[in-house]
Amino acid sequence: MDELLGFARAYTAAWCSGDPAKVADHYSRDGSLTINGGSPSIGRDAIVEAARGFMDGFPDLHVELEGLKIDGDSPEYHWTLTGTNTGPGGTGRRVRISGFEQWTMSSEGLIAASLGSYDAADWDRQVNSEP
């Protein structure tokens, strides 16, 4: 548990770093990230681009580790993201949203697959609605 918690803390720091490659470094070479049941980002290059989308859209992006649940072989990484949508084409609106990722870990101790989830309707309301 301590090792996995340390990994989760490092993953959180990677999301806060502004460097999407640091996020991808936590995935196996052919690892995948799927957000809200969408098309998976497969491989580190694709994961870099997925992370870059959030980081570019929210230059002040901050992710906070809310908890780590271990139930069976798939740990759940619970997080809260805050940031202001001031990137290209941004609305200037502030977002605060919580969600989680269900991880399948590789034999190397990296993420082989992450299934991420958050309330997309709430996200859309926060990003696009008038204050």
For the regions a language model picked out, list residue spans one by one.
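Short histidine/acidic/glycine/proline-rich micro-motifs that form metal-
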Residues: 37-40
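Surface-exposed charged/polar residues within alpha-helices that form helix-capping/stabilizing sites
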Residues: 10-13, 25, 53
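Short, well-ordered alpha-helical segments enriched in acidic and aromatic residues
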Residues: 17-30, 34
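A short alpha-helix capping/helix-coil boundary motif
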Residues: 1, 15, 29-30, 79
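A beta-strand edge to alpha-helix "cap/lid" segment located at domain peripheries
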Residues: 3, 34, 48-131
